[in-house]
Amino acid sequence: MTELARLKFYATQPHSCSYLPDEQATTLFLDPSQPMDVNVYADLSEMGFRRSGDHLYRPHCQNCNACVPARIPAARFIPNRQQRRILKRNADLTVTAARPAFKEEYFELYRRYIETRHADGDMYPPSRDQFSTFLVRDLPFCWFYEFRLEGHLMAVAVCDLLPNGLSAVYTFYEPDEERRSLGRFAILWQITEALRQDLEAVYLGYWIKNCKKMNYKTQYRPIELLINQRWVTLN
């Protein structure tokens, strides 16, 4: 473990919760003057922290603990029947790793995805600046995994490659290809990639029981949830 006790953190003032509309949220951030060290990041991921842009954060709400960090233990994951069908359905896709960069091809896919799937969220309307600030960061552990069908870009999974696992930062994909379930396939691929690289887990971010958009995360079993500072397995 790195010397986490020496790190500085800052809590925000209460603000509107992005997931539960009737709640106020407080967020704890790692001091932005602290260099984005991959080992610090890995240790903090074990404690439920996530990355957004250049910042590491986790919920720090006084009266709510609905945001539960979730990860998939790669070596113990067993795909169910539906997930096996998704893998078969997308066997014609090729995946390549690229360094983070702004490309019109990326942004156009991201724009269509946000406008179609998340027009009710705080990421709408999408812009080039927003896309770059959120995802295009010059970090040595960040990768854009491109999913293509005969050269056509179908999805991009933005992932952080950590010593203890893959952290799924964000995935955007072709919104008109519903039958392929590209978002679910991207997670299945990341589990396979974690196994290939002998990594422990795929970190999915936060699961919220009363948020329908989060329900998909518990479809991957077993899954581990960080409860009372312990990773608890849900089979």
UniProtKB/Swiss-Prot annotation:
Its EC number is 2.3.2.29. Belongs to the R-transferase family. Bpt subfamily. It catalyses: N-terminal L-glutamyl-[protein] + L-leucyl-tRNA(Leu) = N-terminal L-leucyl-L-glutamyl-[protein] + tRNA(Leu) + H(+); N-terminal L-aspartyl-[protein] + L-leucyl-tRNA(Leu) = N-terminal L-leucyl-L-aspartyl-[protein] + tRNA(Leu) + H(+). It is found in: Cytoplasm. GO terms for molecular function: arginyl-tRNA--protein transferase activity; leucyl-tRNA--protein transferase activity. InterPro entries: Acyl_CoA_acyltransferase (IPR016181), Asp_Glu_LeuTrfase (IPR017138), N-end_Aminoacyl_Trfase (IPR030700), N-end_Aminoacyl_Trfase_C (IPR007472), N-end_Aminoacyl_Trfase_N (IPR007471). Its main location: cytoplasm. This is Aspartate/glutamate leucyltransferase. It comes from the Bacteria. GO terms for cellular component: cytoplasm. It comes from Pseudomonas putida (strain GB-1). GO terms for biological process: ubiquitin-dependent protein catabolic process via the N-end rule pathway. Functions in the N-end rule pathway of protein degradation where it conjugates Leu from its aminoacyl-tRNA to the N-termini of proteins containing an N-terminal aspartate or glutamate. PANTHER family: ARGININE-TRNA-PROTEIN TRANSFERASE 1 (PTHR21367), ARGINYL-TRNA--PROTEIN TRANSFERASE 1 (PTHR21367:SF1). Keywords: Acyltransferase, Cytoplasm, Transferase.
